[in-house]
From Swiss-Prot:
ATP binds at residues 135-191. GO terms for biological process: 'de novo' IMP biosynthetic process; purine nucleobase biosynthetic process. Keywords: ATP-binding, Ligase, Magnesium, Manganese, Metal-binding, Nucleotide-binding, Purine biosynthesis. Binds 1 Mg(2+) or Mn(2+) ion per subunit. It comes from Synechocystis sp. (strain ATCC 27184 / PCC 6803 / Kazusa). This is Phosphoribosylamine--glycine ligase. Belongs to the GARS family. Mg(2+) binds at E281, N283. It comes from the Bacteria. It catalyses: 5-phospho-beta-D-ribosylamine + glycine + ATP = N(1)-(5-phospho-beta-D-ribosyl)glycinamide + ADP + phosphate + H(+). Its cofactor is Mg(2+); Mn(2+). Signal peptide: none annotated.
Length: 419
């Protein structure tokens, strides 16, 4: 079968890498792909951007693509799935209506309340003054969220009322029409990515992401500086609870609204010190860098799983098979990220890193005249497997140490809180 992966990040390199390992997949096109997908067997980069919906549809029709896998949220919220489906092309990823789950925090909050899914208490506002008054009344710490896509950076945990007031003003100044102000939930975060075919929901192994740029979870929020899987905070009994109380009720609520949701339900959850689980947010696609830690542990062929979602027969698939052990992904970023950063620096040591028994997934890279150059804030994700978490961590960092480019930065504490 011929597949197309839409996107250019570490998540998309991981998806393409997982897909082409199967003998069932004859060819994989990455639109537009990156420096890593350029070197994968059976894989070809195609210079079409993720928001060029017409060109994507035309390409998939011409090439007779059997399955399109959409990586990022943007094309989903623009309605790429709807357009491909109208042409009779099979696509993994929700329709525009389903992508509201990530595109609108207020819409999702309403859906969760209606479905009786536990989530943080909060209110939605369309003007700064009432939002600021509400935040002051609630007291700090308090959470301020942009109602719209903000590339994973639209959530501010304000430690003081003054900080909340500033954050609210800034989000409205940035052009967001609505914001959500909600209670701060203490505890430990976990990401549960689940597959949904519109009826059945199957959770993947739980992962934990590291959002802050600095060690010890200090500094600015990023798209994610590393992840490990499975996360011990969510053992199988907890995942069963998540399935029954959160994932399945969400899928049912979507179906009740007439939304045929076939794709990833990514639940960002908070596990309180007493073991209570609440939804912080939903995303409508694979997480990045969680995907780089979760998919290498999946033993069931990925294309089989995704096709079962698209063809609405997840129930017939049976339980997913997993490799034993743990996976860790350490993200290597460009100096200055998440602020302004340089591009175009040559990356050395990639082959030496992979000789350390790691897999290097490319994110912000491009291949130019045979050289791999930096081309984004998060540049690489170095993934290692191990019989236990400490082995996987040690192997991942051995790999990272082989890599070198100007201004390279990475956190040295990925996975440590689970040791």
């Amino acid at each position: 079968m011929k597949v197309a992966v839409i996107g250019s990040g570490g998540r998309e390199h991981t998806l393409a890498w997982s897909l082409v390992r199967s003998p069932e997949v004859s060819h994989c096109y990455c639109l537009p792909g990156n420096g890593g997908t350029a070197g994968l067997p059976k894989t070809e980069n195609v210079a079409i951007a993720v928001d060029q919906l017409g060109e994507i549809c035309e390409f998939c029709q011409t090439e007779k693509i059997n399955l399109v896998v959409v990586g990022p949220e943007l094309p989903l919220t623009l309605g790429l799935t709807d357009q491909l489906q109208a042409l009779g092309i099979k696509v993994f990823g929700p329709t525009k209506a389903g992508a509201e789950l990530e595109a609108s925090k207020s819409w999702t909050k309403q859906l969760l309340i209606e479905a009786g899914v536990p989530t943080a208490f909060g209110e939605t506002f369309t003007e700064p003054a009432p939002a600021q008054a509400y935040a002051t009344k609630m007291g700090a710490p308090i959470v301020v969220k942009a109602d719209g896509l903000a590339a994973g950076k639209g959530v501010i945990v304000a430690q003081t009322s003054a900080e909340a007031t500033t954050a609210i003003a800034e989000l409205f100044d940035q052009g967001f029409e609505k914001i959500v102000v909600e209670e701060f939930l203490p505890g430990e975060e976990v990401s549960v990515l689940a597959l949904c075919d519109g009826k059945t929901v199957i959770p993947l192994l739980p992962a934990q992401d590291h959002k802050r740029i600095g060690e010890g979870d200090q500094g600015l929020n990023t798209g994610g500086m590393g992840a490990y899987c499975p996360a011990p905070i969510a053992p199988p009994a907890v995942i069963d609870q998540v399935q029954k109380q959160i994932l399945q009720p969400t899928a049912n609520a979507l179906a009740k609204r007439g939304i045929d949701y076939r794709g990833v339900l990514y639940a960002g959850l908070m596990v309180s010190p007493t073991g209570e689980i609440k939804v912080l947010e939903y995303n409508c696609r694979f997480g990045d860098p969680e995907t780089q830690a979760v998919l290498p542990l999946l033993a069931t062929p990925l294309e089989k799983v995704l096709m079962a979602c698209v063809e609405q027969n997840l129930e017939q698939l049976g339980p997913l098979q997993w490799h034993s052990g743990n996976a860790v992904c350490v993200v290597v970023a460009a100096g200055g990220y998440p602020g302004s950063y340089r591009k175009g620096d040559e990356i050395n040591g990639l082959a030496e890193a992979e000789a350390q028994d790691v897999k290097v997934f490319h994110a912000g890279t491009e291949l130019k005249e045979g050289k791999v150059l930096t081309n984004g804030g998060r540049v690489l994700g170095v993934t290692a497997l191990g019989k236990d978490l400490s082995t996987a961590i040690a192997t991942a960092y051995r790999g990272v140490e082989q890599i070198d480019f100007d201004g390279m930065y990475y956190r040295r504490d990925i996975g440590h809180k689970a040791l």
